[in-house]
Curated annotation (Swiss-Prot):
Record-annotated disulphide pairs: none
This protein's name: Cysteine--tRNA ligase
Keywords for the protein's UniProt record, in alphabetical order: Aminoacyl-tRNA synthetase, ATP-binding, Cytoplasm, Ligase, Metal-binding, Nucleotide-binding, Protein biosynthesis, Zinc
Organism name: Chelativorans sp. (strain BNC1)
Catalysed conversion reaction: tRNA(Cys) + L-cysteine + ATP = L-cysteinyl-tRNA(Cys) + AMP + diphosphate
GO molecular function (one): zinc ion binding
Length: 497
């Protein structure tokens, strides 16, 4: 670790407790995060892990050195959802013979992956060290890196897989401690199965490693051997085996951190662990498992049927949410204002609050250079399980000092914010195109001023200060004075450019 700061502590889903982070090799800290399945544009729920683990990547780079952290985030470009999207979007072309299904699939995945890259760049995320695509790791490779077919063969040879009905499946009963991540006991799953189990499965929890493709579906020539007898199945890999192969290809059989959304704990991450441990004969796949919480939109589960399905592209490039486009930095801060393990209620109000805060920070930071500041305060907050809310409180305090004219605080504000991936633009870039006066709703400002006065009379000073900060972030300066006739506190306001 680069200095004398306290140790990094992370909540490990595997053990259900906070643990001090001790890398296997401080000279090469290794992290794998599940990336997108590129059949549709990434939504706001997908944005959360991208941003959260970007912050962790930035922190690890600062602690161990930029060249000593390897971050792998995959792209899943083989999946039945992709096949279905290709048929939906290019069905007429396929029927008319203008495109093959494989060509249509390639168009879907290339278009969607390109949009994903544009989205995450706008969110201020650093590029991962490696971004492998699943289709590049299906069959044995000339460079000797791990691949899916070889991993499946190893599982067969070690007695963890069987063939049935055109599929190769993982035998969960062959792994005594299957379910350790999700805390689901195999016996309970077998006893509690309430849906019909595929008759070709030995156990309800068994899952597909390789499945047969029809003549029309994409597929690879999978060549396997069972007890000396060859078995050739033209097919495609199961979802879980993809991440086991790609993580091993770049990070080895055991690595430091595996991350993703809470929804991936079971079955995806559980099954990754099963495959990897049984194939490699290791006690763990990764030492630390981190999961971000769920995202709701305006208090409801996000769903197209609810009409609240919001993509990152919608927010950045259309006026579908709140009647306007939103800067990526606003979206980033709105997500970081909630601790990564807590549920996040994404709302118009949260975006407005985040933008007001950023306006306030950019107003005071001026042309300060982050290289001249000290980012230690935010680093200390992040060392406690990526405590971004505490880190943002640090930035509020620095903004207050900077507003009083402290040049050192301006540089520190910039340096600390950059560690979170914020304040990465110049002041002019941020405010270009913003018509501050035109954006002011005078009635709304008067309402907030009146609310603040009520809070002051009730001696609720923290909430009153919060409103002042909110308005200040929008370029509105409050000036308190006494009414000369009644002696009561009054407030006037003006817009400061």
């Amino acid at each position: 670790m680069s200095d004398g700061f306290k140790a990094l502590k992370l909540y490990n889903t595997l053990t259900r407790r906070d643990e001090e982070f001790v890398p296997l090799d401080p000279a090469n800290v290794r992290m794998y995060v599940c990336g997108p399945t590129v059949y549709d544009f990434a939504h706001i729920g997908n944005a959360r892990p991208v941003i959260v683990f970007d912050v962790l990547f930035r922190l690890l780079r600062q602690l161990y050195g930029d060249d000593h952290v390897t971050y792998v985030r995959n792209i899943t470009d083989v999946d039945d959802k992709i096949n279905a999207r290709a048929l939906r979007d290019f069905g007429e072309d396929i029927t008319a013979g203008r495109l093959t299904l494989n060509e249509a699939i390639r168009r879907v995945t290339e278009r969607t992956a390109a949009q994903f890259h544009a989205d995450v760049a706008a969110l201020g995320c650093l590029a991962p060290t490696h971004e492998p695509r699943a289709t590049e790791f299906v069959l044995p490779r000339t460079d000797g890196k791990a691949d899916m077919a070889s991993l499946i063969q190893t599982l067969i040879d070690r007695g963890h897989a069987y063939a049935a009905k055109g599929e190769i499946l993982f035998d969960t009963a062959s792994m005594p401690d299957y379910g350790q991540l999700s805390k689901r006991r195999l016996e309970d799953q077998q006893a509690g199965a309430r849906v019909a189990v595929d008759p070709h499965k030995r156990n309800p929890s068994d899952f597909v490693l390789w499945k047969e493709s029809s003549a029309e579906e994409p597929g690879w020539e999978g060549r396997f051997t069972f007890e000396g007898k060859p078995l050739v199945i033209r097919g495609r890999p199961g979802w879980h085996i993809e991440c086991s192969a790609m993580s091993a290809a770049y990070l080895g059989e055991v690595f430091d951190i595996h991350g993703g959304g809470l929804d991936l704990i079971f079955p995806h991450h559980e099954n990754e662990i099963a495959q990897s441990r049984c194939a490699h004969g290791t006690p763990v796949m990764a030492n630390y498992w981190l999961h971000n919480g769920f995202v709701q939109v305006e208090g409801k589960k996000m769903a197209k049927s609810e009409g609240n399905f919001v993509t990152i592209h919608d927010l950045l490039a259309t006026e579908n949410f709140g009647g306007r486009k939103w800067p990526g930095e606003v979206l980033r801060l709105a997500i970081l204002m909630t601790h990564y393990r807590e549920p996040l209620d994404f709302s118009l109000r949260k975006l407005e609050e985040a933008e007001a805060v950023l306006d306030g920070w950019y107003r005071v930071v001026g042309d300060a250079k982050h290289q001249e500041g000290d980012s230690g305060a935010v680093r200390r907050a992040l060392l406690d399980d990526l405590g971004t809310p505490a880190a943002i409180t640090v930035l509020h305090d620095l903004r207050a000092q900077a507003a009083r004219g402290s040049e050192a605080a301006k540089a520190d504000l910039k340096a600390n914010a950059v560690l979170l991936g914020l304040l990465t633009q110049s002041q002019d870039q941020w405010f270009s195109g913003k018509a501050a006066d035109a954006a002011i709703d005078e009635a709304a400002v008067e309402e907030r001023v009146a609310a603040r006065l009520s809070l002051l009379r009730a001696k609720n000073f923290p909430e009153a200060d919060r409103i002042r900060e909110e308005l200040s972030g929008r370029g509105i300066q409050l000036m308190d004075y006494k009414d000369p006739e009644t002696g009561e506190r009054r407030t006037k306001w003006e817009v400061k450019r």
